[in-house]
């Protein structure tokens, strides 16, 4: 076959592949020959969701703003060109997640490329504009999110971090920065805070407005048996059962506090070796939600002189009077405790607040509406970040 024929065959194959891809997209839900499908569409005090589903018999909308976000749904109506739609009242300003239920199967909105990953689920985002969400959208001056790896001898794994460096970090080679270690909750990983938590957008906006100090934010993977987020499909290390009577005290201690030890003895030194940071307690902060709040409390209990800023959020954990006394002696500059009044861990936060008060440790106890939700954790980050390193 001569070169002209070869090129002709290649061109034909490319055209066929392109046509097949275009046909696939057209069949999917881009509206065919009718007007383009727009979803979601905010108009005044309402928002309309649409899905082109030619062969569906029942289509419903499920959204996190509904009274029962894990089971509540609203019926959608089939319209022209098999486009299903429903118009609902616009919820109050916040970031919400939603999906469609097509003949009993949950599917994402293919018209909305804004998605968040919560553990193993990918969900569409609806950002309702307003004062609450003004720091949750892109700023004009944006930092950089990267994913370095560190070796953990304690956990026996090569592990992945998410690191945010503020706008201007690359162009100021002599400038050093304080560091916030920001920890996720159960079911999350090193990507949770930049996906569901909008940490990069929040820090970008606060720094751009002059409300927060430029800082580096380190977001580790809090699952001690994981190398990285499940999206990388890496093997998970098998761990012994904590209640196994054959375990030694050292093995049991590693199961309990191995990750916190790795955080304080390996991740902190790794960051201080590889990034331009101010390696002093007054330039280190630690915060975490739920399980990460427990890790925050444990880290501050075991290493009281390491962090001058401590922020447990919706936390599972406690501190003894002796541990609080050690924090006072170390000169903690900020202890920011936060929880929602409907959170299932609220009583634990109440108890910790009482202990801190009785032991005379100055602290802020921030109680918000609502429960164990990302809406609260974004609010907390947006609230305490301006208090750091001042």
Language model features with spans:
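Non-catalytic cap/lid and distal C-terminal segments of serine-dependent acyl enzymes
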Residues: 23-31, 37-73, 77-390
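Short, intrinsically disordered low-complexity segments
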Residues: 3-4, 32-34
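Bacterial Sec-dependent N-terminal signal peptides
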Residues: 1-24
